[in-house]
Structure formats: C-alpha cells, structure tokens
Amino acid sequence: MNLEEHLSLGEFHVSNLIKNHISRGSPIQALVLYGGIRRRGVYFPGWVPLILRACACVVPRVVLGKLLHSESIKFGVCSDVMVGSSLISMYGKCGCVVSARKVFDEMPERNVATWNAMIGGYMSNGDAVLASGLFEEISVCRNTVTWIEMIKGYGKRIEIEKARELFERMPFELKNVKAWSVMLGVYVNNRKMEDARKFFEDIPEKNAFVWSLMMSGYFRIGDVHEARAIFYRVFARDLVIWNTLIAGYAQNGYSDDAIDAFFNMQGEGYEPDAVTVSSILSACAQSGRLDVGREVHSLINHRGIELNQFVSNALIDMYAKCGDLENATSVFESISVRSVACCNSMISCLAIHGKGKEALEMFSTMESLDLKPDEITFIAVLTACVHGGFLMEGLKIFSEMKTQDVKPNVKHFGCLIHLLGRSGKLKEAYRLVKEMHVKPNDTVLGALLGACKVHMDTEMAEQVMKIIETAGSITNSYSENHLASISNLYAHTERWQTAEALRVEMEKRGLEKSPGLSSLVLT
C-alpha cells in the first residue's frame, strides 16, 4: 500500500500505522512516513505526540523534535496539553532539560502527565533536587507514574535506599504490578540480585514482565543456572518469557541451548517475533550454525516478521560470521532506511572477509547518508584497515575520531597498534602504548609483541615484556602466549641459551598453552 492509499483511509489509520512502527522498534520508519505526509502538505495535530516519541527513540533526533515544536506553534496546537506534555518528554529524553522547562512554564494548562514528564526529564538528566521540588509541589494529584518516575530516577543514580524509601511511602492503592516491577528493576539494573530475590518473593502479583526481569537479572550477572530455575517456575509462559530465555542463553554464549529453546518454543505453539529472531541469529553467529541461520531467515520471510534495524543487523552479522558474504550484502542492500548500526554491521562484515577497500567505501558512504559514526563504527573500519594493511587510511580515520567527538578506547588503540606493528612501525606503536590514556590490555600488548616477532626485533620485544610483566592483569593463558612468542623470537634470532632459559621459566610457572576451537556448520 502506498502513501496516498494510507492517507485515503484517514487520520486514525495513519496514527495506528505510526504507533505500530514505534512499538515494533522501527521509529525511523515512523519518521520517514511522517516526512512523506508533510511533504504532501497534510497535517494532523494528533500525530505530533507520536512523532515526538519517535524522535526520542532515534539516537535522539532533537533537531527534528525542534522542527515539530515550531510546527506546533505555527498551527496553534502548542498550547494543547497532550502536545505540550509530549514536547517536554521529548526534550527530556534528548537531554534538553532547559527547553523542556521552558515548554512546561509556558503551558497555560497542565495535567498530571505534564508534571510527570517534567519530573522524569529532570531525573533522567541527573537533577534530583529540581525533580524532588516538583514532586513535593504536586503532592495532591500524584499518580502511579509520578512515583515511578522518581523511583526509576533514583535507581539510575544508584541511590537504591532512596528509591526503596519512596516505594515504601507510596500509597498502597497506587502500588500496582508496574510499580512493583519498577522497584524490582532498580535492584536488577544495579546487579543487587540477592535484594532483588527477596523483593521478588514479596511481589503479590507477578506478571510475565516481572518473571522475565528476574531472569534477565540473573543472565546479566552470568548466573544461567538461577535464570533457568526462574524460567521453570513460570507456570503460564508466554512469548516474553521465552524471548528472555533465548536472549539470555545467547548473551552468555549458550548457543546450543538458545537454539534448542527456540525450537521448543515453537513446539509449544509460540510464534517467534522480531525479538526472538534477533536473539537466535546472534546464537547462530556465535556457533557458526549457518544452517539454522538460513532457516530463521526463511521463517522471517514466510511469516512476514518486520526487518527492523535489529533483525537486519542480526542477519548481516550472522551471515558475515558464518562466511556468507553474498547473503550479508543482499540483506544490507534490501534495507530501505539505513541506520548507523546497520552500516556498522556491514563494515564489520566486509572487514571479516578481507574486503578492506569496500569497508572504507562504506565508511565514506555513511557521511553522504548523514550518519554519524560511533565508537563501534571506528572499531569496524580500523579493523578493515588492519586486514588490508591500510596504514595511512587507518591513521587518518583514528584522527577523525576526535572531530567526530568519539573518545578512543582500548580496542581502538589496539587496532592502531596492530596496524603500526604490521607495517613495521614498531617504535611508533611502542610510543603509542606508553602514551595512550587507557591501560593497555593483553590483546594490545600481544599485538605489539607479535609484530616484534614478525620483524625479528628482540630489543623491542624485551621492552614490551617489561610492560607485560608489570601490568598486573595478565592471565596464565596470555602469559604463556606472550612468553612463547618471545621464546620463539629468541630461537629465530639464534639466541638459543636465552630461548631455553625462558622455556625453563615457563615450566616453573606451570604455564600450558590453551587450545583454540572454531566451528562452522554448513548445509
């Protein structure tokens, strides 16, 4: 159905269409739809709150939000309490608290949703004092959401006792299952699972979200056993519960369990949705299960599951890691509205497959699409430079991080050090290790040591080993690999006595080489 046909079905139909895009995790599609409508000169005030929600969802699009604010003033609907409250919420979620407060102060009429939006804006941006002031000011007409905004805010500030104190102050009649779940979320999100467990057992009415929240909490701290135990306690399981189980397995590297749960879920009559397939595709990518990945892709097409950015990225990532560049490219080219995450997946895919030049071209294409690269983008494109041996391009891209306001982390430094090392620039790489603002990890130091071995530079290798020995964070497996590398280097440069002495030292430490494992299942 084209845009004209959608418009012919009326404002209510278009509103539902926008809502569906947002609820399915495709706010960009909602913004594209609204843009097409406005280009045709059509305007309906009821759409504004919905589009403002979409603006707050998309890496917040505050510029578009401000344009909507201007349109609201132009069409005389800015004084509408729903529009005003939505503007406050949008500005708050985008970090523009001053603009949110300006809208709040200028509103001729406010309801409890307006106050809640302003309180939530302050709390989400770390201003508990002003939020508390408004909270006390609205004491007569507080509703459940008012209390929840404050409790959530204190939870984000890791002020758990204050959050619990507010929960205890909350009137009994307002303590619905949502309020209980928010307080539980404070414990879970701060990894206080013992406190969460005690609170969870006291919840009088547990819905699917409450059960899944507990499962997610245990999965987050890597306690798969307890998460699974919670799952088996749920009598009436639904899709939310199954999705939590599958996602938790995938996130903890239990790929086979995730795949088994995926098929068991369908066996019990539950149809996968976008969340399900995103998680199971991640499991397929981890375990190299191209056969299952292809089956999931077929299921997506057969059942009409929306290819939102999460599903698209998961498909690209799965095909890339399972060695199917052709299908990864096909999925990418089928995406009508490309996001930063989508381009990141494709750049990583090209880098994995040794297509460094194409990865750099994709990075350049992002600029033409007005997509701002993030830290993941730079890791992907620097990895492509390493694989392709593009030293000058890598140095230029690393410098560009500053202009894009992206602070390099240890992974970015690791890529650059690897690139310098491969190019024989060992002194420059060593200088970077000494000067970088983050502590070098095993991978970074191992990359430099490996480069020393390739270029037969024992003097530099010994300098690197001094850093490794004093780093204080080297695991046995990494120590063995580093020591083995320098021992081999001594042997290659015919320093036999030194090599033998190092081998003896390794034996004294009881270091053994850790075997590696790689798998890929094809059909």
From Swiss-Prot:
Pfam families: E_motif, PPR, PPR_1, PPR_2
Protein name (record): Pentatricopeptide repeat-containing protein At3g21470
Species: Arabidopsis thaliana
PPR repeat extents: 10-43, 44-79, 80-114, 115-141, 143-173, 176-210, 211-237, 238-272, 273-307, 308-338, 339-373, 374-408, 409-439
Residue ranges crossing the lipid bilayer per the database entry: none
Region (Type E motif): 444-523
Similarity annotation: Belongs to the PPR family. PCMP-E subfamily.
GO molecular function: RNA binding
